[in-house]
Amino acid sequence: LRLEAGETMNALEFLAQFKATDGKVDLGKNVVVIGGGNTAMDTARAAKRNAGVEKVSLVYRRTKRYMPADEEELVMAIDDGVEFAELLAPVKLENGELICRKMQLGDYDASGRRGVVETEEIVKIAADTVIAAVGEKVPGAFYEANGIAVDEKKRPVVDHNTLETSVKG
């Protein structure tokens, strides 16, 4: 994710640091996570538990209804107190604020989700740290190349009792 100004932290790098420091990553009081998938939910929930963090906002350009995250992940983030800032597209980070452009829902796209259309409205969110959790993909091609059956989301198919994949041995 590129902003006009300011830097973001990568979600997977944050999660690794969170684990390595037992939740003591230096993030400041206000954290903003950008994204709407499972990685964004995990990142927001971890940030909420991180030492010194008071508020975690999750920014997404559509509404919760169109987030690709599993419903269970979304519910857990809500239960943990993550605040959702819907219909916002991040533009830049400056002076401790993430500047976002307000969006509105448009027509349905090929994936069945509503597209978004920019408006002229600007929204500012307090942000000491911005973590980008966009574009994280499960390496489905790797699984398939190694003979592991995958589901429609390119996740390995496993036996629910043994957690074995389709590969013998």
Locations of regions flagged by a protein language model:
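Short amphipathic alpha-helical segments
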Residues: 1-3, 44-46, 70-71, 142-146
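General small-molecule cofactor/ligand-binding pocket signal
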Residues: 9, 83-85, 99
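Rossmann-like NAD(P)H-binding beta-loop-alpha module
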Residues: 22-53
